[in-house]
From Swiss-Prot:
This is Probable F-box protein At4g22060. It comes from the Eukaryota. Residues 12-48 form the F-box domain. Coiled coil: none annotated. Disulfide bonds: none annotated. It comes from Arabidopsis thaliana (Mouse-ear cress). The lineage of its organism: Eukaryota, Viridiplantae, Streptophyta, Embryophyta, Tracheophyta.
């Protein structure tokens, strides 16, 4: 298809080669990209063949249950918020488990799982959670309560019947719609459950570790365990295979023995795994003191022999999106704070041993240089009641 005729006003900027325009447009942020579309017909045509820079973090905010819209906040525009409306009754009563690009991994009130595109409304239904995994069978007792049977029998201890479905992960290719969806549960060790394009049942792999956090990036699954070890599984083939494992010198019992009573009582903390642009793995510890709304963070990187976590004081020109477990380049992109951590709070309330309730104050950008917290969204969201939020990197190809 040939581009439309160019405007005949003699302006040379309207006659730039299409390849050059596309190259320029793909370097723009969202705001400048939208402005360039209105310059002339040739620029509008070029914009439809490209997309704004994909590495700018946006914040998606979910209102109270029963509302069929969500809110988007762009880091480039400090005083503006976008509303995506009419997302449907099912969306209004669903809960977001994970996000990738412009796709949401959702569960409805009956714990039916699906993924949907925020902008096109395209939806893909996923298999039922009630499944058989070798000797283990998962049964749904009520809306969000699941029991497990081993060899078709319940465990002798009633509380051990219950399983906690966690570590929700989504990856999808916007062009081909190929996807990978994951979640996990514990039964002695971690069972990693996954579904790929074309699957009508859940596949699984039992792991000989108990995981704290899982990240999926570049067709690899990174697992972080309670012993502070990292395993990497390659998902390029039908059956995932292990390609990397650490042997970290860490004694969890010794650390607990030396922990002070004050530290144990006055704060709550969680550890996260992050994979950098060049494939390095980082350990990020987030901590909040009881009766406080101020978060603090520490970052660690494996030493050269992969046996010890060393404290890292700078990310250089990268920034961490903790919700996604990745870093993005921040040195040339307006709207991203370099050497910072983008955080939206804990998404599983049972992490908290105290009465800390999630609020919009948990959404923040932590600057590693100053050790200070910024809440860029707060001035425009103070009057809006939200129930949750996540930082993500949207794909605006279909806008």
């Amino acid at each position: 298809m040939d581009p439309p005729s160019l405007m005949s006003d003699g302006s040379s900027w309207s006659k730039l080669p299409l390849d050059l325009l596309i190259m320029v447009f793909e370097r723009l942020g969202f705001v400048d990209f939208q402005r360039t579309k209105s310059v002339c017909l040739a620029w509008l045509y070029a914009s439809r063949m490209s997309a704004p820079n994909k590495q700018i973090p946006w914040l998606i905010m979910f209102p109270e249950k029963g509302k069929d819209f969500c809110l988007l906040f762009n880091s480039e525009e400090k005083e503006k918020i976008y509303r995506i409306q009419n997302l449907g009754v099912e969306f209004a009563n669903s809960h977001c488990l994970a996000i990738y690009g412009s796709w949401l991994f959702m569960r409805d009130p009956r714990y039916k799982l699906y993924i949907m595109n925020l902008f096109t409304r395209e939806r893909i239904n996923l298999p039922s959670v009630e499944s058989q995994f070798g000797r283990i069978k998962i049964e749904q007792i009520n809306d969000d309560l699941f029991y497990r049977k081993v060899d078709d029998e319940y465990d002798y201890h009633p509380k051990r019947h219950m399983i906690d479905i966690s570590d929700h992960i989504l990856w999808i290719d916007d062009k081909t719609k190929d996807y990978v969806v994951m979640w996990s549960f514990e039964c002695g060790y971690t069972y990693m459950v996954y579904c790929r394009t074309g699957d009508n049942i859940w596949n699984y792999r039992s792991l000989d570790i108990s995981t704290v956090n899982i990240v999926y990036k570049d067709h690899k699954m990174y697992l972080y365990s309670y012993t502070r070890d990292v395993k990497v599984l390659d998902f390029c083939e039908d059956i995932p295979r292990q390609i990397f494992e650490t042997q970290v010198n860490y004694d969890i019992l010794m650390e607990k023995g030396f922990r002070s009573d004050v530290d144990d009582v006055l704060n709550d903390k969680k550890e996260h795994l992050v994979v950098t642009l060049n494939g390095d793995v980082l350990r990020v510890k987030s901590k909040i003191w009881d009766n406080s709304d101020v978060w603090s963070f520490c970052i660690y990187k494996l030493n050269s022999s992969n046996t010890y976590w060393e404290k890292l004081t700078s990310l250089g020109d990268e920034a961490i999106l903790l919700d996604l477990g990745i870093t993005v380049l921040a040195n040339t992109i307006e709207g991203i704070n370099r050497n910072s951590i983008y955080f939206s709070g804990y998404h599983r309330p049972h992490y908290f041993r105290f009465d800390h309730v999630w609020s919009e104050k948990d959404i923040c950008v932590f600057n590693l240089d100053t050790q200070e917290v910024e809440r860029p969204h707060q001035s425009i969201c103070s009057s809006i009641q939200i129930s949750g939020a996540r930082w993500f990197v949207p794909n605006f190809k279909h806008i």
